[in-house]
Amino acid sequence: MRITMIGAGYVGLVSGACFADFGHQVCCVDRDAEKLAMLKLGKIPIYEPGLDDLVTTNTLQGRLRFDDNLADAVSQSDVVFIAVGTPSRRGDGHADLSFVYDAAAEVGRSLKGFTVVVTKSTVPVGTGDEVERIIREQNPDADFAVVSNPEFLREGSAIEDFKRPDRIIVGTDAERAKAVMGEIYRPLSLNVAPIFHTSRRTAELTKYAGNAFLAMKITFINEIADLCERLGADVQDVARGIGMDNRIGAKFLHAGPGYGGSCFPKDTLALVKTAQDAASPVRLIEATVSINDQRKRAMARKVVEACDGSVRGKTIGILGLTFKPNTDDMRDAPSLAIIQALKDAGASIKAYDPVGMEQARKMIEGIAFVESAYAVAEGSHAIVIVTEWNAFRSLDLKRLRALMATPVMVDLRNVYRGEDVVKEGIAYSSVGRERHPVL
């Protein structure tokens, strides 16, 4: 089938490349001339394992192309996906839908023949209704259907998530649209990936509810971690113990510095605002947002505590800047608030990330970016593991100890066992577990 993907960002590029790999003809449309130039040269503007090869292969085989001419692409398409950004609106926290509505208006002016218009972007309930109204206003005689098909891609494993999904949610009551969506996802249905049909509004809310639940689960285990520190329990064992219950499950029960990234912070806030507007507040999610916002500065206080109550005049080394491993995404990364809080407390900061340095330099000022974990350790009064990159899981602890001004490790991801670190002469603090002073 012929597919137009409006937006060549994270969701649009991954989805477009995967659809092309299924054999569809895909055109990714974007307004960013610099990004399009890079993509046409085979340069991928985001870091996602496997995406470079997928884009290159399908571009060379003629199934994937990039363009800025939305009207031309839409007029030739069977399916048009809207995969543009929906950031939090400044001032009130609602999702900013201006890019979605602008795209809908352009689509409306360009439709020819029956076309399925799909909102792939994460949007509040009722957005599909407005997209339909806008298209109809622009083109009263257009033959089209608007579908909600939310994405469930995790950065760092997005291709695997797209090709082997837990489920595919299709929100529409239009039978012709259901048939078209079934056809474009047919390769996945052969792998027994269930297509779940529901109403458009239900599909829109399902995406927000899913992300909010996962954010709440992360926040829950972080609260339990704080309690573990007070009571002398081990949060990792607590998480394992409750995760063995198949009603709960082990995923998203890893205590740490709080959630970040492009989805959870934005989507939980948007759900809170949507619920407030509907006079049906979601108090659990309101609490989740508040607790997570406070979490990052609480982690900075943990670092200060590990440094004998003050970091003024001290150098703190940060290992990991991105919000999670296997991505270069710095959006709402815990490192941003932690670094700022430590700077406010008088610390000098050195930092390293295996992939995220370029993006971090755009967002963080007044710190030293260095080229390895050991360069971070050199002269530091403490090192702080903020992101659990595999490269940080097997550091030479003896070498770290020799390089540091004072031997202190604050492990915000519980990567190490305290006894292993202390054995090498490094004081060790973690999250929700016993603190280990130097022997």
Residue spans of the language-model regions?
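Structural/interface elements that position substrates and couple domains in central-metabolism enzymes
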Residues: 1-439
